[in-house]
């Protein structure tokens, strides 16, 4: 299929030509191109570490490019920072939302540029201007509401409305649907299409293939810091996109696995958490070598189960038995001592120490084990274990001293999982482990889960991706509004059946 050309599509709104950027020991970008035209939604795809974030940081002046040019609306530009880019009409809606929760919605909309009447803020005009934008975008939110009262999807929409208020010509969206329900996603898509109709060029970053086919007009694919292709989405298949992203054909999305669950290792009976709203009367068994999925819609309290098992949430009732013996797991340290490990849902908030290095992040879950009787650290064993995490998990990093925040999401997740494996867990609990991660890294995590199950470990995975649960688990526990509404054998169920169960108590 022929690549999109200027002659085919008309003048570009944004042209990033032959952008190159190097860091010590790493060629992050090598002559990369990204061309976006008005009235279009342009997908930017690639595995974690392909160079997407670096390219956008060059656009916003966070990194200075080594070579290449950036042309916006026909003029060459070199933005010094994101504020200058925003003022010129280039906006980005981040995964990590930036609302001030204690302020009102309209305060957040106009922060730093309040309309004034003399020396005072003109609250009436600020309200009216916000309401006008909301009406144009069909946003049903009171401008006077506090940021803290908004859902994640509403916060996402406010960020888009803010870009709209700057009269942005280019809007970049980074994984905007990662925490949204299907209904919220559809509302977000309708707003994105309104921006497109106004002439905006949307750069859309997502690992969710179905969204790319549903929403996007063109796609640019990066791999290992290089531009691979820019093509119309229409006519492409999922397998073609994956092959361009990973450099090979992925004939299967999940590893081959023979399910051979052994004896019951974990027995949970009538588990109820103390904190409200809570889970109530949750009972299940986990077998050696089993991968157990937990499904449910947003608000089902799936995460509460693993947090209670791990001692983060206090239980008010119920029993936990490991290999036939009662355990309490009244704290995370106690849970770890019993062989539990938890990879949390919010990787950036609770999984990594973003400003510390890969080495520290590899060891932090097990740091006490490196101390001798004198309280001194065994540096030799620490270095050996750090290298094990990097090698065993195939972490792409310049070295163990690199800040983990500079790594791609997939590589950050590999470090987190690797550090828990250093604790030699019997039960590994994974909460949305592949959220925001590319297909190649997903497959590696599935392979790891399969290998651990083969060794007799018990795996619990929470996922909002139904194909993921159906593709990797043995059984699926279904939750609705804090209650367990079913336990199904994966081979004997369907997506529709799971969704039916998950909707029982809504």
From Swiss-Prot:
User: What is any one of the record's Gene Ontology cellular component terms?
Assistant: plasma membrane
What general EC class does the enzyme of this chain belong to?
translocase
Entries under Pfam families matching the protein: ABC_tran
| Statement: the UniProt record of this protein carries the keyword Zinc-finger | no
Q: What is its EC number?
A: 7.5.2.11
Please verify whether the record's keywords include Nucleotide-binding.
yes
Q: Which reaction does it catalyse?
A: D-galactose(out) + ATP + H2O = D-galactose(in) + ADP + phosphate + H(+); methyl beta-D-galactoside(out) + ATP + H2O = methyl beta-D-galactoside(in) + ADP + phosphate + H(+)
SUPFAM superfamilies named in the record = P-loop containing nucleoside triphosphate hydrolases
Q: Which residues form the ABC transporter domain?
A: 14-249, 264-506
Assigned keywords, A-Z = ATP-binding, Cell inner membrane, Cell membrane, Membrane, Nucleotide-binding, Repeat, Sugar transport, Translocase, Transport
Q: Which domain of life is it from?
A: Bacteria
Complex formation: The complex is composed of one ATP-binding protein (MglA), two transmembrane proteins (MglC) and a solute-binding protein (MglB).
So what does this one do? Part of the ABC transporter complex MglABC involved in galactose/methyl galactoside import. Responsible for energy coupling to the transport system.
Q: Which PANTHER family does its entry note? A: CARBOHYDRATE TRANSPORT ATP-BINDING PROTEIN MG119-RELATED, GALACTOSE_METHYL GALACTOSIDE IMPORT ATP-BINDING PROTEIN MGLA
This protein's name: Galactose/methyl galactoside import ATP-binding protein MglA
- Origin species, per record, is Sodalis glossinidius (strain morsitans)
- Gene for this protein? mglA
């Amino acid at each position: 299929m022929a690549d999109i050309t200027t002659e085919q599509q008309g003048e570009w709104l944004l042209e990033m030509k032959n952008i190159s950027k190097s860091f010590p020991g790493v060629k992050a970008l090598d002559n990369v191109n990204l061309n976006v035209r008005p009235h279009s939604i342009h997908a930017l795809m690639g595995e974690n570490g392909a160079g997407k974030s670096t390219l956008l940081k060059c656009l916003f002046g966070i990194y200075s490019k080594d070579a290449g040019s950036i042309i916006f609306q026909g003029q060459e530009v070199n933005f010094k920072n994101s504020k200058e880019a925003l003022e010129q009409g280039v906006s980005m809606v981040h995964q990590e939302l930036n609302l001030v929760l204690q302020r009102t919605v309209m305060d957040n909309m106009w922060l730093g540029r309040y309309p004034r009447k003399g020396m005072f803020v003109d609250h009436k005009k600020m309200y009216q201007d916000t309401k006008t934008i909301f009406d144009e975008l069909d946003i049903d939110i009171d401008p006077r509401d506090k940021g803290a009262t908004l859902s994640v999807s509403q916060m996402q929409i406010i960020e888009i409305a803010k870009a709209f208020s700057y009269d942005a010509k280019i809007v970049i969206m980074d994984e905007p649907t990662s925490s949204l329900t299907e209904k919220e996603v559809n509302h977000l898509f309708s707003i994105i299409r309104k921006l497109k109709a106004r002439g905006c060029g949307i750069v859309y970053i997502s690992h969710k293939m179905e969204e790319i086919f549903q929403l996007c007009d063109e796609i640019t694919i990066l791999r290992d810091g290089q531009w691979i292709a820019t093509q119309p989405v229409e006519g492409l298949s999922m397998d073609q996109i994956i092959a361009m992203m990973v450099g090979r054909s992925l004939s299967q999305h999940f590893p081959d696995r023979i399910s051979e669950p052994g004896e019951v290792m974990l027995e949970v009976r009538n588990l109820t958490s103390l904190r409200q709203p809570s889970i109530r009367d949750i009972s299940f068994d986990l077998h050696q070598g089993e991968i157990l999925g937990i499904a449910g819609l947003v608000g089902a309290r799936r995460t509460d189960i693993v947090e209670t098992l791990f001692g983060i949430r206090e239980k008010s009732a119920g029993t936990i038995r490991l290999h036939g013996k009662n355990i309490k797991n009244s704290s995370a340290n106690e849970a770890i001592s019993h062989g539990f490990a938890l990879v949390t849902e919010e990787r950036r908030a609770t999984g990594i120490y973003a400003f510390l290095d890969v080495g520290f992040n590899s060891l932090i879950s097990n740091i006490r084990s490196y101390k001798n009787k004198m309280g001194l650290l065994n540096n030799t064993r620490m270095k050996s274990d750090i290298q094990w995490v990097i090698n065993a998990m195939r972490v792409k990093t310049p070295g163990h001293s690199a800040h983990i925040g500079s790594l791609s999401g997939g590589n950050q997740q590999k470090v987190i999982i690797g550090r828990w494996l250093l604790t030699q867990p019997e039960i590994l609990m994974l909460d949305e482990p592949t959220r925001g991660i590319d297909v190649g890294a997903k497959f590696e995590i599935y392979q790891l889960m399969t290998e651990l199950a083969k060794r007799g470990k018990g795996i619990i995975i929470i996922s909002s991706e139904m194909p993921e649960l159906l593709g990797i688990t043995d059984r699926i526990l279904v939750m609705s509004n804090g209650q367990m509404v079913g336990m199904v054998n994966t081979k004997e169920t369907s997506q529709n059946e799971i969704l039916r169960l998950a909707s029982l108590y809504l």
